[in-house]
């Protein structure tokens, strides 16, 4: 039972790291990636549809993205969704593709984005610690109910602490990489 609890806790911790990785991918750096468009939904025939399902992305320059819709009739809707998003970019439409030129990040904007990244990292750490607390309570209950011995309980808590440190370390490493990416010009 303790092993099941540890396995479940590790899955939840992995999910927290995965969410942090996605959050970091959505924070814009000096180099643009298609991931910055991942949260944009396009009103496509009345249904909100992720822009990645409607178009392909090409990055010819570090600050330019060319969006090529699979269906030319969705060009206007994609352009409107990008313009209305919080990306701070004004897309231009030439009839077949949409060009998005992103402005250079100012030093102050970079610092603000580092703060956002640190906040996202702290949210992930808190989530991991909450999973640890819940799993520790479950292990304590299993030992208290007599379903496992105290030695097993201590071993389980030790394994849980090691997993917690490992996953918090992964979040810290993701944050370190994102900060260096943001602060390099």
UniProtKB/Swiss-Prot annotation:
Entry's family note: Belongs to the RRF family.
A Pfam family of this chain: RRF
Keyword Nucleus set for record: no
Name by which UniProt lists this protein: Ribosome-recycling factor
Originating organism: Frankia casuarinae (strain DSM 45818 / CECT 9043 / HFP020203 / CcI3)
Signal sequence bounds: none
Compartmental location: Cytoplasm
The keyword Metal-binding belongs to this UniProt entry's keyword annotation: no
A Gene Ontology BP annotation from the UniProt entry: translational termination
Record key words, sorted: Cytoplasm, Protein biosynthesis
Molecular function (Gene Ontology), one example: ribosomal large subunit binding
């Amino acid at each position: 039972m303790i092993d099941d609890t540890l396995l479940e806790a590790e899955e939840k911790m992995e999910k927290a790291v995965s969410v942090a990785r996605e959050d970091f991918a959505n924070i814009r750096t000096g180099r643009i990636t298609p991931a910055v468009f991942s949260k944009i939904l396009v009103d496509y025939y009345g249904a909100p549809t992720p822009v990645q399902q409607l178009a392909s992305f090409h990055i010819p320059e570090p600050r330019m993205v060319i969006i090529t819709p699979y269906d030319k009739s969705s060009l206007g809707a994609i352009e409107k969704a990008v313009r209305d998003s919080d990306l701070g970019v004004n897309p231009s439409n030439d009839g077949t593709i949409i060009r998005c030129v992103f402005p250079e990040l100012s030093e102050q904007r970079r610092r603000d984005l580092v703060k956002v990244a640190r906040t996202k990292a702290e949210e992930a750490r808190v989530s991991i610690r909450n999973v640890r607390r819940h799993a520790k309570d479950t292990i304590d209950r299993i030992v208290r109910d007599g379903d496992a011995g105290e030695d097993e309980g201590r071993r389980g808590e030790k394994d849980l602490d090691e997993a917690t440190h490992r996953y918090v370390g992964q979040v810290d490493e993701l944050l370190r990489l994102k900060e260096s990416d943001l602060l390099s010009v």
